[in-house]
């Protein structure tokens, strides 16, 4: 099910609702196991706080007496402390004022930084809904780089976090909480930067160093459900996405398909093979793929060139 709107408001969710209503007609002892985070990129923005209450109210209405909300509350996850707080409170009282719960948590947990982080949440939520881009549990920040994570909004988010850090600069505990909560934004900046050929590589290096230092400082052990650690991510990022001495001879080459990729890859296939950018860890991140058959294509380099090896 998509996660940018409640279960009742999207097609896949409505299939679930229909099944839930069927079960509730014959049972008052139902358990729901609800997935509520991005398992591919746990340390990335996942602004779904606005749907929590309606979904929990739906469960209660349909005789759900046991609710396991799997939101992977690991260190560094997107506002994982507040997510656990709000879900717990709404389980006890599905009719509580959800916005008031958010304010209560932020005021107590972030102190004077709270107003800026509240703005951050609300602006990103609005941008997500306005973009029309779905939010799902195997997502990538790259999917949202023209929507809620577009360049203008990323600048706004950075400014809000800068103000939040400044507001609690004299309180070590509060400052570290803000810095920990900033990691998902910084991770998304790194992920998007690696897909932009004209991105500021020195800025990416500096941000990567900060991300590496902060994840170690705050004990962030994993970035996804595969348990890939931040340190490994940073090593691979430097190797794959930051400039190397060697340039690809196939950069910008014309691609002639003998066997076309699967339909879901064709939109980016011509560029993805020759843009000198590595694909990410999931298929939505610049993969070009064939299923059940071999890849066949011609790369036209435009002129004769000498080369010593081929890598993919």
List where the protein language model places each region:
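Acidic/glycine-enriched edge-of-secondary-structure segments
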Residues: 1-8, 282-286
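Catalytic domains of carbohydrate-active enzymes that cleave complex glycans
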Residues: 34, 62-63, 89-258
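Structured mid-domain segments that build the active-site/substrate or prosthetic-cofactor binding neighborhood
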Residues: 3-115, 119
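Disordered, acidic Ser/Thr/Pro-rich linker "stalks" and the adjacent N-terminal cap
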Residues: 239-309
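Enriched - but not universal
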Residues: 26, 36, 95, 139, ...
């Amino acid at each position: 099910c998509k996660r940018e709107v409640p279960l009742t408001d999207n097609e896949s969710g409505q299939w679930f609702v229909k099944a839930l209503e069927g079960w509730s007609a014959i049972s008052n002892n139902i358990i729901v196991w609800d997935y509520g985070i991005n398992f591919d990129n746990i340390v990335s923005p996942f602004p779904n706080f606005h749907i929590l209450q309606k979904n929990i109210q739906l469960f209660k209405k349909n005789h759900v007496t046991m609710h396991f909300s799997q939101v992977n509350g690991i260190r560094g996850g997107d506002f994982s402390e507040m997510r656990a707080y709000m879900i717990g409170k709404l389980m006890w009282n599905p009719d509580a004022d959800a916005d008031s719960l958010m304010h209560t948590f932020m005021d107590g947990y972030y102190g004077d930084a709270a107003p800026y982080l509240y703005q951050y949440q609300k602006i990103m939520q609005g941008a997500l809904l306005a973009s029309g881009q779905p939010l799902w549990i195997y997502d990538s920040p790259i999917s949202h780089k023209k929507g809620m994570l577009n360049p203008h909004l990323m600048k706004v988010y950075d400014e809000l976090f800068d103000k939040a850090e400044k507001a609690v600069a004299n309180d070590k505990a509060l400052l570290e909480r803000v810095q920990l909560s900033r990691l998902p934004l910084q991770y998304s900046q790194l992920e998007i930067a690696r897909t932009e050929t004209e991105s500021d590589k020195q800025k990416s290096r500096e941000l990567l160093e900060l991300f590496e230092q902060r994840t170690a400082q705050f004990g962030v052990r994993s970035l996804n459900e595969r348990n890939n650690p931040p340190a490994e991510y940073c090593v691979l990022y430097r190797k794959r996405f930051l400039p190397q001495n060697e340039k690809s001879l196939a950069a910008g080459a014309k691609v002639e398909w003998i066997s076309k990729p699967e339909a879901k890859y064709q939109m980016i296939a011509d560029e993805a093979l020759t843009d000198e950018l590595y694909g990410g860890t999931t298929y939505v991140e610049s993969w070009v793929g064939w299923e059940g058959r071999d890849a066949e294509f011609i790369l036209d380099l435009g002129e004769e060139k000498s080369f010593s090896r081929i890598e993919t």
